[in-house]
Every structure is written in C-alpha cells, then in structure tokens.
Amino acid sequence: VNEGEPTSVRRRSETRRRLLAAAAALFESTGTISQRVEDICGRAGFTRGAFYSNFTGVDQLYLALHEEQAARVWERLRHALDAQLAEESRADTLEDAVGFLLDSLPDSREWFSLRSVLLARAAADPAFAARMTLDDGHVGRELGDRFVALAAVHHRVPVVAAAVLAKAVVAAHVGAVSQSPVDVSGALTQRLTVAAVIRGLTVEAAAPTRT
C-alpha cells in the first residue's frame, strides 16, 4: 500500500477546491466565464501546472463549478420533497408545498447566474451543450418520481412523463429566479410560476369508483 497516496489525494482535492472557489469569486465579480487561466491560478495561489493537473481548460472548470453548486441545490430539493411526501409534515395545498420547497433551497443566485451564462454558451457550442444535457438528464431522473408523488399527494396526476415534469419545474424556477434582480416580488413570482407549471402539467385524479 502506498502510504503517500492519501496525502496526495487530499492535496489534489484541496487544490481543486481552491481553484473552484477562485473561479466562483471571479465569476461573481465579473459576471463572465471568459477568465484567463493565469487569473484563476493567481486568485487560488497556484501555478498553471496545478490548474491543468485538475482541469483541461476554463470551460471544464466552470462546468465542474456548476455541477458542484447544482448538487447542493438538488440535494436540498430532494430532502424538501421527501418532507412534503411524509404525512406528518406535508402542506395542505400544492401552493403551500411549493412555497416550502422554494424556502428550503439554499441562496443559490450565483448558481442560477452561472447557469444562465453556461446556457448561452451552450446555444453556440453543441459539444458544450451535450455536457450540460447529461447533467440535466440526471436531474430529471432523480427528481421526476418525487414530483409525481407530490402531485399525487394533492390529488393530481401528471399528463407528461416524470422526467419531463421535473425538467419543466426546474426550467420554470430558473426562469423566475433570473428575473429576481428586476422583480421586487421575486419570491412570490417563483412560487406562483412553479405551482402553475405543476398544475398545468397535471390533472385532477379521478375519484375512486364505488363498487
């Protein structure tokens, strides 16, 4: 067993973490992913060699940052959905359930801003778009069944596939959040938009047939 391996793994992990943190800080201050490797390395306190031992380029770095931030959002959303599926903690109405879900999310404006920039890049770069598509497909599979179950709790049945419902909800929320800088009622807009999408893609469940 190579006793030095755990230390090198920890060192590599710390290098990656600091590079991601530097990229996040630069994006927050500039609003763009068009950063130079030298600027990211200078912010993180590393050489170009350390950068390229972790990432093939700036695009891969920002995709990794997006995935890391998204993972935190999805994890909180999964837990919030599970809470709404539990009888002892569920809300009385679909709108209240949506409010609970959105209130449970971390302050993720930076992620939504980064996602918007990455989507704009994806529109002009098919290869870049393919990498983001894989990420979104995973989200749909993870969350789809939970959104179907949430609809069922409120006596509604989806008219689309579970993954499509989940993607539509995420798209609606991302779109509403993107308006936050110019929307003084941003939280209400997000709640109404997400609830409207769920209602629009579901119908009332049929009443049980009496025998």
Q: What residue ranges belong to the model's regions?
A:
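Hydrophobic/aromatic-rich alpha-helical bundle segments in the mid-to-C-terminal region
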Residues: 129-133, 150-211
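An amphipathic alpha-helix signature
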Residues: 20, 95, 137-148, 166, ...
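Generic hydrophobic, amphipathic alpha-helix propensity
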Residues: 11-23, 40, 65-69, 73, ...
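N-terminal intrinsically disordered/low-complexity leader segments
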Residues: 1-14, 206-211
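Helix-turn-helix
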Residues: 18, 25-64
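Short loop-to-helix capping motifs
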Residues: 57, 121-126
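Hydrophobic alpha-helical connector segments
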Residues: 60, 64, 77-112, 162-169
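Amphipathic alpha-helical packing segments from all-alpha helical-bundle domains
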Residues: 74, 106-116, 126-152
